[in-house]
């Protein structure tokens, strides 16, 4: 046999027969996911929602909305953080092409087309797709709706601290320090002089004074590892009802400087609106609790007189651990006292302890799956609206994984691959045992 050599320069054929194109079987996970989407009429639903954003006749060729949303779902299932990475991964995989809806001979869309389509379709439409996915979960009996756990995490923004500018004068940080040094008598300050001025200055990271010119919605904040970055705060409302599996029923995005007590009620309000939209479907409503968002379970960061009073006034029972604040004084605060004491009684009961444990399990798990293995901890988009669009569909991918876990036992393609590897290992082990038994039998003879 003659040795062939890799051709570094070749002339591509002008025409290529369809039979000569590479063939590969569809990925069983994505094939089953596409079946679920087809059974629930995903394509007609999305096309109807997005019709107002496209020209009725003529117009330049575009990325179909059903392909666009499948693109974003791949970000979760493949653990890809950027739209550029999603486009590269799709172009390199025949099974992913089949999932999105590309023929073998079709060129896939690049990241700029994906970005342009995201800007074309508004935030409300992304929210409606998120609600549509929740309806699938409800029809499968995976949403209860009465008890909601809430927690938040920080996401690093695609913006560097060294690029921030002052809100009033639009000076850069370097220009601002230079002006302060000159005002103190240093005509030509060196780097050491600027560093000294910076160390001696108070309120260096004030969000009231500084912003990023290209991402004004991001806020200066300390991350969990102790570093300081421009960041956003993503807050999840997770279903914790009896028989629930931890579906995310609402996700909100705000600047990282907003406290937990300030964002609790808006997040619960969004959860209530989403669940009410889901309950409009009779089949989904039959599987859900008649009372929606009637219990809120959080960590101690959400505990305050005001937040507990707000929950009490809306008829929502709170299960919020109380931090040690020493002796409390209730003069003129009888309503706040009543709400705090009622919450204290609930968290000390057996049901309260059980719900707090469930919150720690289910809510924290959503952060691990969506932001760590799902690849969204570090953002690559700028602007709250752009990020929230991507985040809503990314979280929808997590919710769809709960449906897949119920139907096929695994929620991601990697999980299914691990299951197959386990079966292969089991058969290999059985084969080794059989060989050992046969060897012992032959020896005894």
Q: What is each residue range found by the language model?
A:
Residues 26-73, 78:
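Basic, short loop/linker segments at the boundary and entry of helix-turn-helix/winged-helix-like folds
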Residues 1-23, 416:
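Short, flexible loop/hinge motifs at secondary-structure junctions
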Residues 95-101:
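Secretory-pathway/luminal and periplasmic proteins that interact with or process carbohydrate-rich
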Residues 19, 59-62, 102-104:
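A short, ordered amphipathic alpha-helix with a cationic face
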Residues 80-91, 102-445:
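Anion-binding and metal-coordination hotspots
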Residues 22, 26, 35, 166-169, ...:
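Intrinsic-disorder-associated interaction segments
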Residues 54, 75-76, 98, 118-121:
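Short amphipathic alpha-helical interaction patches enriched in hydrophobic/aromatic residues
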């Amino acid at each position: 046999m003659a040795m062939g050599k890799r051709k570094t320069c070749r002339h591509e054929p002008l025409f290529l027969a369809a039979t000569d194109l590479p063939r590969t079987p569809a990925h069983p996970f994505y094939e089953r996911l596409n079946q679920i989407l087809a059974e629930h009429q995903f394509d007609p639903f999305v096309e109807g929602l997005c019709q107002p954003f496209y020209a009725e006749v003529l117009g330049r060729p575009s990325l179909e909305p059903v392909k666009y949303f499948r693109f974003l779902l791949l970000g979760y299932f493949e653990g890809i953080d950027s739209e550029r990475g999603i486009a590269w991964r799709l172009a390199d995989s025949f099974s992913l092409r089949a999932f999105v809806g590309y023929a073998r001979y079709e060129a896939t869309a690049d990241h700029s087309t994906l970005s342009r389509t995201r800007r074309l379709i508004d935030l409300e439409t992304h929210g409606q797709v998120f609600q549509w996915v929740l309806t699938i979960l409800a029809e499968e009996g995976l949403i209860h709706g009465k008890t909601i756990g809430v927690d938040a995490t920080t996401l690093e923004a695609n913006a560097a601290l060294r690029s921030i500018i002052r809100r009033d004068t639009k000076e850069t940080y370097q220009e601002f320090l230079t002006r302060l040094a000159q005002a103190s008598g240093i005509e030509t300050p060196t780097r050491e002089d600027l560093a000294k001025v910076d160390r001696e200055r108070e309120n260096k990271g004030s969000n009231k004074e500084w912003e990023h010119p290209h991402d004004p919605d991001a806020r200066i904040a300390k991350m969990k590892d102790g570093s300081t970055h421009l960041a956003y705060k993503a807050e999840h409302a997770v279903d914790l009802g009896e028989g629930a599996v931890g579906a995310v029923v609402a996700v909100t995005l705000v600047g990282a400087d907003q406290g937990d007590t300030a964002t609790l009620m808006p997040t619960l309000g969004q959860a209530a609106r989403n669940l009410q939209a889901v309950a409009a479907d009779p089949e989904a409503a039959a599987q859900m609790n008649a009372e929606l968002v009637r219990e809120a379970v959080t960590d101690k960061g959400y505990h305050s007189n005001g937040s507990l009073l707000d929950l009490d006034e809306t008829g929502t029972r709170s299960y919020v651990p109380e931090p040690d604040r020493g002796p409390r004084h209730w003069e003129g605060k009888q309503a706040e006292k009543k709400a705090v004491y009622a919450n204290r009684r609930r968290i000390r009961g057996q049901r309260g302890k059980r719900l707090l444990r469930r919150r720690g399990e289910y809510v924290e798990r959503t952060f691990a799956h969506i932001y760590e293995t799902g690849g969204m901890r570090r953002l690559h988009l700028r602007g709250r609206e752009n990020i929230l669009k991507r985040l809503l569909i990314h979280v929808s991918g997590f919710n769809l994984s709960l449906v897949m876990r119920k139907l096929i036992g695994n929620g991601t393609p990697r999980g299914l691959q691990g299951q197959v590897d386990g079966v292969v290992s089991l058969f290999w082990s059985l084969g080794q045992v059989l060989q050992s038994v046969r060897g012992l039998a032959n020896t005894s003879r």
